């Protein structure tokens, strides 16, 4: 038994958990936490145009295999376990059986912290779908467990929508995680995504931007890279969180 919190991440596509919260995953994993990532799809359509362009005649199953390998390598770099429910993407359609699988994983791991997408994203509706399904699944799991105790409500945080669409999605972060000490780990994980080679440079710049905000809010000059989240779960405790 460990006193370290368990994290579960619900990600619409292969790259989302790495680009949006890869630093936070690495930070918790390095500190001894179990981190389990549930990808709802491989992003075989919406995230893989390069494969479709460069490999004439490639099949959907072959694209999925490439993305699965990239996903597994990246998760290994971050120190996370990962599975994919293979719901398909663009559009992402999550069925009842998939939700039951997600509930089963929540019962198995009983995370204290859950990370998923921001709830509004008109330019990438798969992300909003993933957020809706993840939040409903947590609610279902907190109501009943046919095999034991209902899930204790975890602390839920919503990560970045697609950059640079934050203004259009009304995302307003209230939580910043300093990932300076694990930023190179995040970059190495992003570099495993040969299908999306531009992401590492892109999220380096955005990590710097969020760090600038975090420095301005805290006065801490040592924050060079950060990830931003919006709290979904109300805080309940004997004292204010610090």
Residue ranges and their predicted role:
Residues 1-10, 81, 88-242:
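Metal-dependent de-N-acetylase/amidase catalytic core
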Residues 1-109, 238-239:
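Active-site rim/loop-helix segments in enzyme catalytic domains that contact anionic ligands
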């Amino acid at each position: 038994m460990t006193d370290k919190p368990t994290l579960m991440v619900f990600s619409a596509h292969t790259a989302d958990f790495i680009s949006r919260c890869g630093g936070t995953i690495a930070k918790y994993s390095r500190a001894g936490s179990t981190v389990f990532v549930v990808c709802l799809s491989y992003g075989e359509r919406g995230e893989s145009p390069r494969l479709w362009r460069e490999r004439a005649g490639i099949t959907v199953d072959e694209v999925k295999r490439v993305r699965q390998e990239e996903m597994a390598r990246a998760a290994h770099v971050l120190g996370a376990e990962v599975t994919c429910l293979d719901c398909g993407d663009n559009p992402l359609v999550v069925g009842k059986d998939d939700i039951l699988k997600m509930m089963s994983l929540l019962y198995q791991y009983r995370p204290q912290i859950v990370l998923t997408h921001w709830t509004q994203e008109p330019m990438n509706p798969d992300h909003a779908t993933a957020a809706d399904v993840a939040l409903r699944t947590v609610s279902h799991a907190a109501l009943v467990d046919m095999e034991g105790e209902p899930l204790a409500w975890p602390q839920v945080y919503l990560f970045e929508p697609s950059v640079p669409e934050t203004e259009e999605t009304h995302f307003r972060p209230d939580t910043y995680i300093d990932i300076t000490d694990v930023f190179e780990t995040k970059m190495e994980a992003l570099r495993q995504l040969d299908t999306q080679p531009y992401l590492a440079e892109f999220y380096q710049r955005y990590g710097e931007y969020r760090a600038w905000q975090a420095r301005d809010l805290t006065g801490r000059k040592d924050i060079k890279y950060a990830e931003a989240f919006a709290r979904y779960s109300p805080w309940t405790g004997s004292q204010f969180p610090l």
